[in-house]
């Protein structure tokens, strides 16, 4: 399972899978909760559930690296600073450094910013990064162990 209406990452991955596989699922991404077309139709519910499983399989096969940043969430938190600047640094939106592999699913995304940046994010992909954040990232990596 999973819930693409509760995870923007799942939403983007699912939309790219739909585009790649040339599958039509008109209710995908509609609303922040399941619309009546899904709630009232066992067929639509089953179709979304099957696609959620496909998204889970795809995400489950990914290699993920995480860094522990033990502070509270918020726009001025250390984790927000690291996230914002890491996205800006890695994005190919402003100055392509290294493009995503040819097999990267994001090439099929209906979202131009995802295809252009080579990241699953939409926020911060067109910003410049502050190199000072690398010190904070290094500290977080060392603390993560």
Question: Where are the regions a protein language model picked out?
Answer:
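Boundary/linker segments flanking structured domains
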Residues: 1-145
């Amino acid at each position: 399972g999973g819930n693409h209406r509760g995870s923007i990452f799942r939403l983007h991955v699912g939309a790219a899978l739909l585009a790649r596989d040339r599958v039509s699922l008109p209710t995908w991404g509609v609303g922040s909760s399941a619309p009546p077309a899904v709630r009232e139709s066992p067929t639509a519910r089953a179709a979304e559930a099957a696609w959620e499983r496909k998204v889970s399989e795809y995400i489950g096969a990914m290699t993920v690296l995480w860094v522990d940043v033990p502070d509270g969430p918020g726009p001025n938190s250390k984790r927000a600073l690291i996230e914002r600047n890491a996205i800006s640094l890695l994005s190919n939106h402003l100055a392509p450094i290294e493009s995503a592999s040819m097999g990267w699913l994001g090439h099929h995304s209906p979202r131009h910013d995802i295809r252009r940046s080579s990241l699953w994010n939409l926020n911060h992909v067109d910003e410049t990064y502050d190199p000072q954040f690398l010190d904070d990232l290094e500290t977080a990596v060392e603390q993560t162990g």
